[in-house]
Amino acid sequence: MSYTKFSKEVTKWLKDNGLPCYGTANDSPEETKARLDAWMRGIKEILRQWITEKRYRELISCAHGGWYQDDVIFEPLAEHFVANHLFDELRFLCERGIRFSVEDMLSTIKSEKEERVALDIETIRNIDVPSYVAGRSYSHLGEIAKYRKRALDQIIRYIGYLEQIHAPAEYLEQVKFLQKIVADLTIKAKDLKPFRFRL
């Protein structure tokens, strides 16, 4: 719902400012580029407005929706939360993605164990994730490595934000422990319980 509201406001801003907001299959590459550039300007403007209006829940919902790359809404929003010491909002923004990546990894681990009984952790650690993702083949071990890398990247980014915001030491240690057990693949579903914060 928030994504729809956000997109409508971007479209309205583009129209109000005489910028292109709709394209056709017949558009030239230049027209398409101009429209996409205008759309990005509109996104930045509406993001700025919503942040000024403190529409944080709606922006977090947009970030969680996955419609935009992280650098479009997620990262500017996280940086705003850090700069303004909005710890609860930062938690709500960041924990969900981490939790979902870990849950996807755990689900794939469960499937792998049902087929093979033992999990080859060393093989998973040695998988070149970018090459695996670029390829066309599917394997449980490749998927586990992909979700593990995604979760670790998200956790590392989150730790950086937490250090900047001077998060409570106990909570920061919990996140660092989560990083360790994701890295060594010893994590269990119950380990995610502290990471279900909601505003």
Question: Which role does the model predict for each range below?
Answer:
Residues M1-W67, R198:
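N-terminal alpha-helical interaction modules that lie
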Residues T32-M40, W67-E75, S101, A134-R136:
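Generic helix N-cap/helix-start motif at coil->alpha-helix transitions
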Residues I43, F74, C94, D120, ...:
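TPR repeat positional signature
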Residues L47, A78-E79, I98, E114-V117, ...:
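Conserved small-residue packing positions in alpha-helical repeats and bundles
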Residues W50, K54, S101-D104, L162, ...:
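Alpha-helical junction/boundary sensor with strong preference for TPR arrays
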